[in-house]
Amino acid sequence: MKKKKIIFSGGSGRFGKIFQEVNLNYKIYFPSKKLLDITNVKKINSYIKKIKPDYFIHCAGLSRPMNIHYKDLSKSIDLNIIGTSNVVKVCQKNKIKLIYFSTNYAYPGFKGNYKEESALLPFNNYGWSKLGGECAVNMYKNSLILRICMTEKPFLHKKAFADLKTNFMFHEELANILIKLINKKGILNIGGKIQTVYDFAKKHNKDVKKTSARKMLGKKYPLNQSMNILKYTRIKNKIF
């Protein structure tokens, strides 16, 4: 049986490198930034015409450091909003299923337990840039938006916030289940159980120390960025 083809943008990033190690029954292409320039519709179209993929997993874009989305507004817009819009245009034109990596930062981050249909109000420019990409993806019905909360393994920091709740999961968990999700459509929150960053980190690094997001990031910083992952959990339970 002929393997279906997937183009994965952002293969040189943290998650992309881990995803490349997963043994899958698909032919997956990880083009370089030069080969697949998402700011150039003609280049995207040319590469897609050559590969003829069944799926396009769009993970490429600008993420860290977070202040880059303030310091270089043009780059943030070009990559995360316009670049994503370009990918949508080409996928729609060629009838390719699109899977888009978004973020839990699309939610306000104050009340927590946000469902996929909850009101959106990003609390920083990174969240706005990813939500801008979502707007384009939502216009294309043959798509799946993943609002993801994940981090590197092992936990990189010596201190962790004891007053900030979220849904951290490691890249490896998503890498191992992503391929099982690609035929879904709509919007899906992806992450681990709701807990403080400190509680998550402590399970994997006993030496991590407590610190306060309120003290470090200010009184206005949202402290409950957690998502409701019931839909994701139900899907995962059916798979395994």
Question: Which residue stretches match the model-derived regions?
Answer:
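Adenosine-cofactor binding site in Rossmann-like domains, unifying the SAM/SAH pocket
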Residues: 24-47
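Active-site "gating" loop of Rossmann-like NAD(P)-dependent oxidoreductase/epimerase domains
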Residues: 62-74, 103-123
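NAD(P)-cofactor binding segment of oxidoreductase domains
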Residues: 70-99
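Active-site Tyr-X1-5-Lys
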Residues: 121-149
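Mid/C-terminal beta-alpha module of Rossmann-like enzyme folds, strongest
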Residues: 177, 181-224
